[in-house]
Each structure stands twice: as structure tokens, then as C-alpha cells.
Amino acid sequence: MDSSAGKSKSGFVENRSIDFIPENERHGSIFAQFTLWFGANLQITAIVTGALAVVLGGDVFWSIIGLFIGQCFGAAVMALHAAQGPKLGLPQMISSRVQFGVYGACIPIILVCLMYIGFTATGEVLAGKAIAHLAQVSNTTGILIYACFIIIFAAIGYRLIHWVGKVASVIGLIAFVIILTQILALSNISELLAVRHFSWSSFLLAVSLSASWQISFGPYVADYSRYLPTKTSSTRVFWAVGLGSLIGSQISMMLGVFIAQVSNGGFVGNEVQYVVGMNPIALVITFLYFSIAFGKVTLSTLNAYGSFMCIATIWNSFKPSAQISKLTRLTIVLAMVIISTFIAVVGEHTFLSAFKSFILFLLTFFIPWSAINLVDYYFISKGLCCTNLSVKA
């Protein structure tokens, strides 16, 4: 357990870990929830996810429709998880002890850790390429530089993560306008949308890609709403998180669909270079490389922070009296980033095929977990608050 009870909420570096957040330390706003998830989804991996719908056989029109349907379903699910945060005041996965028990919850938590590592590794591949071009270094060096930023941001914690989310929202919007403008200059969008060859397999793949993208946030979305005051409206949290994630990811995935269609195969294997190379202006190219790297930092930091929460929860299951210090946080984050960095370096050249398999695997696991958690919370426990749920369960 963390021994930081009673510490001031004013510090920028987070003191707490998996313990309950008391009312006098609650802070934050509904708008910050929107900007965090909006910014976290305006990034290159979401663009690649959208592009997969076309790369794997879909057309522009039905891919966009399928992606949007999946977004709506998935965002609703993840937003229902987010609404638990202010009421429980605990990280998302520790609440799984209600459904699975103290030791049983370790099984889904371990799988969530694998998800964090996988998503961080894919982010490092793409952001590492962007940093490599900015700094004129090798891709491997770019990945290592990016990994250092993840470690620093995740070690500092909650407040910095929300600040990064706000900045990423602004940078991501500017990058979106630039890329969309270039797409409009290179092709006729109405002509792209007019080519339609519907097939159930391609359509359902698009739905699955976006739904699994959104649902994969479920295991840690409440980690970033748990500091909100207990009386915060669950409905407002639901809409802020859900709309932020839905709008941000749909923008990115729609861009991915258009880019994959106009690239004539040039996007595959050259995702970062192709997106940036669509614009001929050197200053704009530099900004786009920066926006790709910074946009990925938000989500990768969420993953590293979430991995700390999960591993601390497992540790607490077997050693309830153990102290979780800032050094422990740093050590856990460092270990997770080292593993993901190794995977990123080794798997850099097989990125797209591995990413497709990875994101669809998430769907097969997280839908059952999410269904169990939500049914229990909203229909059986009926919004169980933390006064009835100790960290020791």
C-alpha cells in the first residue's frame, strides 16, 4: 500500500498509487477528460488503424461507415468504465477484485499489462521514426529517445499526463488540418467516396478494428477520472470521455482511410514517411514529424502509467503491507518501457501485420472482461463506492 495518505494535492509530482483518493485531494474538470482522450486519439497509430480497413480490402465509403459504427459502440463501453472513476476513487483494474477476487483479478491484470506493452511497442516504432527524422539519427536511436520521454512523463504522473493531453489536442488538430488540406489537394474526396464495393468481411473488419481500439481503453480509462470529486456527474464524465475518444479517433482513422486509398500501396511499410511526405514545405514537414512524436507520447504515457497501476495491484495482492514509493513507480515504469522498447526494435519491420493481429486479439479478450465488469457495477453492485471496497478487498 502507498503511505502517502494525507499528503497535499498541490504537488505536480503524483504521490499516490493504487490507494483510494480522499475527497480533499480530488481535483480536475470534465473538460480535461475530453481533451485527454481527444488528444490521445489524434495520433499516428489511430491513422494506421483506419488505413488497415482499406489496406485489407475495404473501400473508402464503407470503411468510414464501419469504423464509425465501431467507434460508437466501443466509445460507449469505455465511457461507462470512465464513469466509475470518481465514484470508486481507485484505478480501474483494482475494481476487478469485486468480480474476480483478489487473486483471480491478477489474471486479467496480467493480460492488460501485455496490452500496455504491445501498444507502447507499436507507438515506439512510429514515433521513433518521426524522432529519427527530426534528430537525423537511426530509427533505433529515435525509439530510445522516445522511450526516455515516456519514462519521465509516467514517473511524474497524473497532472502532467492531463497537461500533455491538452497540448496534444491542439497540436493534433493543427496537424489534422494540414494533412486533410494536402489530401484535398492531391485527390477528389467525392470521387473516392463514390467508389463502393461493399463486402461483409471488409465492413465487419472495419467495425472490429475501431471497436477494439476503443474497448482496449476500458481497463485503464477510470485511472484518469478517479481524481474527480465524488459528486461529479457520471453522465457528464460519460459524454466527455466518450465524445473525446470517439471524435479524436474517428478523425484519425478517417484520415488513415483516405491516405491508404490515395497512396496506391505506398503507405504500407512507410507509414510515417508517407504521411509527412504528402506536404512539400520543409517547415510543415518538421512540424508533422514533431506532432507524430508528441501525439504518441500521450497514449504511450497512459500505457506506462497504467502498467504501473496494474503491477502495483498484483504486488499488493500478495504483499498488502508493501510500500509503493516513487522509486517503485519509476522502477516498474522503467521495466515496462525496456520490454516494449526491445519488442519495438526487434519487430519494427513487421509492424502492420503484427499490429492487425494484436488489436483484434484485444477484442477477443476485453469484450468478456468489460461485459462482466459493467454488468456487475451497474446492475449488481449498482455503483458500489469505495467506502464499501477497500484496496485489500
Where are the language model's segments positioned?
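Juxtamembrane transmembrane-helix boundary signature
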Residues: 66-100, 107-115, 298
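Selective recognition of specific alpha-helical transmembrane segments in multi-pass small-molecule
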Residues: 43-46, 69-77, 112-121, 171-182, ...
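C-terminal membrane-solvent junction of multi-pass transporters and transport-like membrane proteins
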Residues: 369-393
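Hydrophobic transmembrane alpha-helices that form the core helical bundles
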Residues: 105-136, 293-314
